[in-house]
């Protein structure tokens, strides 16, 4: 088995399900290029009793042919190619029956949503296969994968049809953390420093396939130019494919993404509706929910006198999408664009914005550093409705032990200096927050920086300091 980087929890769970001694139906989902197929195939490669993969946008006849060829590979080479899905799953049933010897039989169907072409009868045949037979066979472990998250959620995970409550386990594959990204790059022979890893993570996110495209002979800037700004840049063309593979009617999702990309602070549901000129919010609710499920968007509560879920703020957090919409969507013919921006305010501003997003994606690591892993917390950003200009706090972690970590997030390539003016701004923000919310909890000023805070007369303001290294755990 090829070494699998990261995914420790997922490997433990899949191994546990394999040895459960009962029938298992596991749905693995997540964005395109996240490593779903890689994980399952590497973990169970010599244990498949049957496996096949759906083909994106192929007609029913082609999908059935692929299914039939897989049946031949694992069983009778003279097996007729099925012409409808009831025949296909009946043949699979007979194949598995012939293999039953009291040992686990792993059935893997990759890109399952692709098989559900219009009027093909796939869903009904699949439901009958599982509900009518496979669910009662203790040897069977059925694993299905899909990038089309909207289909996976609607038809499997939250199904109200024949597969309602039939899935025994769902498994969402999230992007890599900074630490997992570091481990992957080390395994590929990179000797990059953590600031370089943070910078590339700020652009690619923790998507394993994107990271696999990096060239260790180039630095961050050279890789970014090659992947985004060269004449045939691989990741410039990825954007449209990404959303069309994840969501049916992807245009609705991309419109929401484009609106959120235009507002750094995030937007309320009402503001999004106004921007898109929507009269009804039913579709928007579904779109936002699925974007959140895929880690493209986060919805965080707001706080006035109390924490309010009703007025949630939605913010684009997918780093690849954010970078694409900021620098590629407008378009440029400069093939060395990112190199030419080195050290300039536009690039530094980007890294500052992205570092805020990276911190939001590493709340568990921040909580671990603070020693509050087991304490219930609410986290959110805050914007004053009174002060002019409006005071804003990047991140607040409100804890059940009656303390609040008021976090200032600062990116720099050297220890951050708190000046007299910055000290005053932070103190004013704290005062505004306490006055407007009426919060009674103790406030702990917390600085999250790349290289710590430079020791000056104002450094004492940062009662807690969290550095970039503390996110790499």
Question: In which residue ranges do the predicted regions lie?
Answer:
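A cross-kingdom feature that marks ATP-driven nucleic-acid transaction machinery
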Residues: 3, 311-473
